[in-house]
């Protein structure tokens, strides 16, 4: 098989500091590394043709796209890929999985202000029927870096910051809407559960 085989080891440190009456400051540090056990296809010409280069018929935009896809696949086949950055959990101003590489570092701070805890109010919104237990506003700042080699990790850093509104339901779910902006503009996400949760 020409597919790579690799293991990913991710370490995550989260520190919660209570502030005010019921609010929290959270710090998060994630370090993720891919360890290749078997490389995949590394012949760039084979990968270019697999991605349609031979069907471009001298169209420069098509050739550039096929070459870019081939180089991305070559990096994954050679080095593996660790925890990606971008999306609702890490670097929220970027699309899901926007940055990936063999090595990742991510760090963030988030202030979670619980401003209401009346509890028991009925929520009936589209597909959500639940009781509202707590309302929360969050402000966050996050940075991250990916690279193919450990020595390059941290040399190119992407930044994201923003705010969000959350409510904790009686069923235990947390519904979250975050607005973030960063190096490539704004992004809005609606998602269930807190950030930095590992989703299967």
Model-derived regions, located:
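Outer-membrane beta-barrel "beta-signal"
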Residues: 165-167, 186-200
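C-terminal outer-membrane beta-barrel translocator/porin domains of Gram-negative envelope proteins
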Residues: 1-130
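Repeated loop/turn-to-beta-strand initiation elements of outer-membrane beta-barrel proteins
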Residues: 20-25, 116-119, 167-176, 198-200
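Outer-membrane beta-barrel transmembrane domain signature
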Residues: 114-120, 124, 128-132, 136-161
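Solvent-exposed loop/turn segments connecting transmembrane beta-strands
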Residues: 1-5, 97-106, 151-158, 179-191
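Transmembrane beta-strands of outer-membrane beta-barrel proteins
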Residues: 11, 25-31, 107, 135-139, ...
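Residue-level signature of outer-membrane beta-barrel architecture
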Residues: 15-17, 111-113, 167-169, 179-181, ...
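Transmembrane beta-strand segments that form the barrel wall of outer-membrane beta-barrel proteins
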Residues: 1, 92-96, 137-145, 173-183
């Amino acid at each position: 098989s020409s597919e790579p085989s690799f293991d990913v080891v991710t370490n995550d440190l989260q520190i919660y500091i209570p502030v005010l009456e019921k609010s929290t400051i959270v710090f998060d540090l994630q370090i993720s590394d891919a360890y290749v056990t078997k490389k995949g296809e590394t012949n760039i010409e084979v990968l270019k043709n697999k991605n349609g280069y031979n069907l471009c018929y001298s169209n420069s935009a098509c050739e550039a796209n096929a070459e870019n896809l081939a180089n991305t696949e070559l990096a994954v086949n050679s080095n593996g890929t660790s925890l990606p950055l971008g999306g609702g959990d890490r670097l929220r101003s970027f699309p899901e999985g926007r940055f990936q590489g063999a090595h990742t570092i991510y760090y963030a701070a988030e202030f979670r202000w619980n401003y209401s805890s009346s509890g028991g109010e009925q929520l009936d919104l589209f597909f959500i029927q639940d009781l509202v237990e707590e309302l929360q506003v969050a402000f966050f700042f996050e940075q991250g870096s990916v690279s193919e080699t450990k020595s390059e990790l941290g040399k190119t850093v992407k930044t994201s910051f923003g705010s969000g509104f959350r409510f904790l339901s009686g069923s235990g779910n947390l519904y979250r809407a975050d607005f973030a902006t960063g190096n490539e503009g704004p992004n809005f996400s609606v998602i269930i559960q807190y950030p930095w949760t590992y989703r299967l």
